[in-house]
Amino acid sequence: VLVILQQGQLINKTGVDVQGIVEIVSPQKTQNEWTFVGAPFASDYTLGAVKPVSEDVAMVKYNYTQGAWSNDWATINTHMEAAEGTFAWPFYTGAITFSTHNFGASTSSIYPANATADYTLNNGDVTVTKSTLQNTEGGYWMALANPYPAKLSVSKFLGENTSRLQGGCVYVFRNGTFDIDANHLSSGSDSIAMTEGFFVNFQENAEKKAVFTKSQLKNWNGNNTQAKSSSEFIELTLQNGKDKVRVYFAHNEDAEQGYDIFDANKMFATTGVAEPYFVTDGIALIKEEVAELPYYATMNVRSQQDTVMNFVLTNLPEGYAVSIIDGEEVIDLVEGGVYSTEILTGE
């Protein structure tokens, strides 16, 4: 069983579906309170995919015929559509988990010995079309959910759907209340988490259609792998003769543009070859894979001897730039290029 935890992501860069049983743990944690969720499955599914099932989680669907929420609780056999959002009320503390295994009429959350994958993680485009009825509060609402097991970019989703939407925004339901997520985000976030539901309000004369594509994913890059390994990181190799050390940088989606490169964290070396470590509040933290840095980050090199150091840059994603500030000179590194500089003893 593959488990994708609350802050995890699974971005499938291939056209081949993930096989086997996968659990997706929702980031929304509530107890005795409404939350808004949906499973990232490729096709219709039943609430038998919710773990724990039945008496532990109550769910209701949106009734498009009536333009209102259903008065009936969903049952273990109620069908949900791909990218459909539903209100859920957990009767326990913890997260709702969706499984590609259908537990069916059983209320057990334990996999049987012959458990099979009844549902497939969504790995393609999804188009949701409804004949929405104007509800009592006005507007033509659609209840949606992120159809991918990874973060969905609000701005990218709006880029393909804004012309049909009222207000050019989406509405999320977080911490028991509604909030607006738009290009100018009142919530300070541009992400719809995996399994998170949201609402859109269509213009009266617009086609009631919502389009999802994998290119709308927050961390989507069609040219590079997204697996959580060193290949995801920009790799900078420092060489000194036969000795070398690799330093990895990863993009942090929460960083702010315009970060002052001279204010970034610094990494020092205590040997002839640079060894990266942060100095934060006077504490040295050794860390090769650096995942929590701003868009711009500096690496200072410190050596115990005079030497010549070569900088080699690989795995640079499209649209990214890496520069070295050598004294007063700023050098833009190119993919696969080598920059040599003399490093004196000290920093």
Predicted features along the sequence, with ranges:
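Conserved "landmark" site that anchors the functional core of diverse proteins
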Residues: 25-31, 39-44, 48-64
